[in-house]
């Protein structure tokens, strides 16, 4: 029986794209900061001159799938991380954005074979979003760790 796991080794060669929604940037900027901290602590060059990391900003979470798809199809990246924050309001807009963003991001991973990390917070209040982006913990860190694990795992799977 074979067991396949991400090992967090040889990360010096990994190329990562991060796609960040500008809407609710009070939250998404904190998620990005946590994500970059995790990547840096695991040996990924996160400096402005980095050849390992690119960051793309999009208007909102609805646009995350399209840009993620273009980056994944480029062949330059082993993993794409999406970061967004959709906060429930008084209209059905929340449900539409969350459904389309999540389905679209999942489709990108399936269609391209490139792991795409779903780092979109879906909360009822701004307070809940802020708690998940740094007040209590920073899920951006977790999304960075997931990306590193998936990049490593994909390298050891048969056919890669």
Curated annotation (Swiss-Prot):
It is an enzyme of class 2 (transferase). 5-amino-6-(D-ribitylamino)uracil binds at residues 23, 61-63, 85-87, 118. The active site is at 93 (proton donor). It holds the Pfam family DMRL_synthase. GO terms for biological process: riboflavin biosynthetic process. Pathway: Cofactor biosynthesis; riboflavin biosynthesis; riboflavin from 2-hydroxy-3-oxobutyl phosphate and 5-amino-6-(D-ribitylamino)uracil: step 1/2. CDD domains: Lumazine_synthase-I. One of its GO terms (cellular component) is cytosol. (2S)-2-hydroxy-3-oxobutyl phosphate binds at residues 90-91, 132. Its EC number is 2.5.1.78. SUPFAM superfamilies: Lumazine synthase. Belongs to the DMRL synthase family. This is 6,7-dimethyl-8-ribityllumazine synthase. It comes from Synechococcus sp. (strain CC9311).
